[in-house]
Amino acid sequence: MSPWPRWHGPAMARLWGLCLLVLGFWRASLACPMSCKCSTTRIWCTEPSPGIVAFPRLEPNSIDPENITEILIANQKRLEIINEDDVEAYVGLKNLTIVDSGLKFVAYKAFLKNGNLRHINFTRNKLTSLSRRHFRHLDLSDLILTGNPFTCSCDIMWLKTLQETKSSPDTQDLYCLNESSKNTPLANLQIPNCGLPSARLAAPNLTVEEGKSVTISCSVGGDPLPTLYWDVGNLVSKHMNETSHTQGSLRITNISSDDSGKQISCVAENLVGEDQDSVNLTVHFAPTITFLESPTSDHHWCIPFTVRGNPKPALQWFYNGAILNESKYICTKIHVTNHTEYHGCLQLDNPTHMNNGDYTLMAKNEYGKDERQISAHFMGRPGVDYETNPNYPEVLYEDWTTPTDIGDTTNKSNEIPSTDVADQTNREHLSVYAVVVIASVVGFCLLVMLLLLKLARHSKFGMKGPASVISNDDDSASPLHHISNGSNTPSSSEGGPDAVIIGMTKIPVIENPQYFGITNSQLKPDTFVQHIKRHNIVLKRELGEGAFGKVFLAECYNLCPEQDKILVAVKTLKDASDNARKDFHREAELLTNLQHEHIVKFYGVCVEGDPLIMVFEYMKHGDLNKFLRAHGPDAVLMAEGNPPTELTQSQMLHIAQQIAAGMVYLASQHFVHRDLATRNCLVGENLLVKIGDFGMSRDVYSTDYYRVGGHTMLPIRWMPPESIMYRKFTTESDVWSLGVVLWEIFTYGKQPWYQLSNNEVIECITQGRVLQRPRTCPQEVYELMLGCWQREPHTRKNIKNIHTLLQNLAKASPVYLDILG
């Protein structure tokens, strides 16, 4: 037998991996300077003998210096200088520590290319002076300088100023040696003629017309005499400056409209610090229509446009050359404003063939005007076959409607655009016949649909063969959907072929084209559903009821080896048809595969007789939404007796990071939740939160769902634009929902967009508006929410990064779990 197979398999893969790791460390060690050790991200030089005399540099063609994030140097008495080019190669450097060494001098530009540097520790060195110019471009979190023999001079007064104005290095006891060689606390240091500079501009605001020129003057003062410079940011217009001691001027010529709203700053800087004064530049210019496109259909018809102008242009629409008087049926909507740019649309509510025609937009302000025209076609005239009669006039430009009210389609006898009365009569008869035929067809289709719904009742799990995995509706323990590579025929209609029971009626759900059926081969090969004896289940009381059946609190015996009995939640199956049983077993297999500390645990099934039973972990405190409301500022309104303790910020962060952990797991298993909300999370002992529900939430939280076409239920307040508009559900759409869950947590369970109707919510979300920051929410968490609510799915934050950020915030704020009593 060939020995070759012995070099394959997991064992050999691990061996090769170990060899590569050892090789990497060996290669790194060869590139290290003497007395130093290196890894791919770290350099440390702590051996005093023989020690180093210069800042450590890596050998060429060895470790990539850009990957080094930390350098530690200690006990190097012969290291005295950091030159300008010593650190420039370490562009990824975050932490620099040089302690108990001989460092005396740091070049001004030593850290010029180290923009990622956050922590510097120069404790117990030989520094006698250190300029703020070393660090002014860095966003440092820590600068530790204790134990250095600083000389009391104006050169170090900036450290005193820093202590007085910033958090770091205020915890340090810094001293300097005075002329008598005595240690003087830096906090008490007084140096004559050594203070902060000042900068003053003539005016805080500046308004100028496009194409003109302007000069901005600035005066500075201070002792030591400051240097004056201008910070113009990304100014587009041509500019030049002149400075002389305490005066400076900035000349801007041929000013561009692109510079409107920008800030220009005059900066004065000396040894002690800096001061600046800023002016806001406003540029006035004539309007231009930069974008006008054919109408698009969403929840309303929209003719999109973009207009630039300052002051804000007045907008006027014309329809077929006549002024269009706006009304509730047709009006201008501005969706996004960016100082001088306005993005919006002419919104039309259910336009007909009567609204077909030419639409002209005119934008006008005191500096000029601009206009553009677009032809719009919404639908053909009823009763006309354009394929057989292509020459028939599609758009009749006479005033069949009055522009003041697009909804008024009353014809006036003297305005009929035809001179042939007989032809007009024939067309009217044709229209009547068409309406009768259409009405008959619609009535027949409705009758067929009712019969199909009557005959095609599905199981409580809302699944049909391999096309569904775990139902999106309330009939399963968790509305999860698995992504796989099987085949399925997607349905794009409002009433998809699948039907699930919500409440007491069958409701069709939309089949999602992005996800396909899972095959048996994709289940884990070791999937084993635990079967529980019926005599081991003792019902205690009813917890609730959904369309699938009832949920009970129960005691289950012999389930865990370490406990004689435990409390569980059992879900019963009311429908005992063959299809329901097949779906029941399939869901049980899938739930068995979902094992995570923040997913409600599925114990197994009981199939001895009827009803069929699923056994789940019991979560003592119920769903998270009720829990949040019961522990919020309004709890006193709902509580009987003493109101519960209000949740703290740290406890809310603890809840949030647990939900994020569960979502990370679901994403790793290629599951999309599609209905993540606090109502679908459960709370147990010691503030333990898990994702999962028992199919009752849509009865209790019916106002959280929006009926589409009278049937389909969608949680639109938790859905991103692509899910609302295109029924597209992905891990990224779950990230959006997670952002809304964070908002729910920090508002103590308020309904998102509670002040708006469902239609208004759809409009807000599709137009790019987001929820406001809750009063109790830290800015870091709100920025995380905004990262979840990016319009483009690929720009949203990664679910793993969200979990890591929440974990770090939660660790920084210890949690006290006595809230549950």
UniProtKB/Swiss-Prot annotation:
Transmembrane intervals: 430-453
Regulation acting on activity, per entry: The neuronal activity and the influx of calcium positively regulate the kinase activity and the internalization of the receptor which are both important for active signaling. Regulated by NGFR that may control the internalization of the receptor. NGFR may also stimulate the activation by BDNF compared to NTF3 and NTF4. SH2D1A inhibits the autophosphorylation of the receptor, and alters the recruitment and activation of downstream effectors and signaling cascades.
Reaction it catalyzes: L-tyrosyl-[protein] + ATP = O-phospho-L-tyrosyl-[protein] + ADP + H(+)
Residues the UniProt record annotates as site (Interaction with PLCG1): 816
Site (Interaction with SH2D1A): 705
Protein task: Receptor tyrosine kinase involved in the development and the maturation of the central and the peripheral nervous systems through regulation of neuron survival, proliferation, migration, differentiation, and synapse formation and plasticity. Receptor for BDNF/brain-derived neurotrophic factor and NTF4/neurotrophin-4. Alternatively can also bind NTF3/neurotrophin-3 which is less efficient in activating the receptor but regulates neuron survival through NTRK2. Upon ligand-binding, undergoes homodimerization, autophosphorylation and activation.
Protein name (record): BDNF/NT-3 growth factors receptor
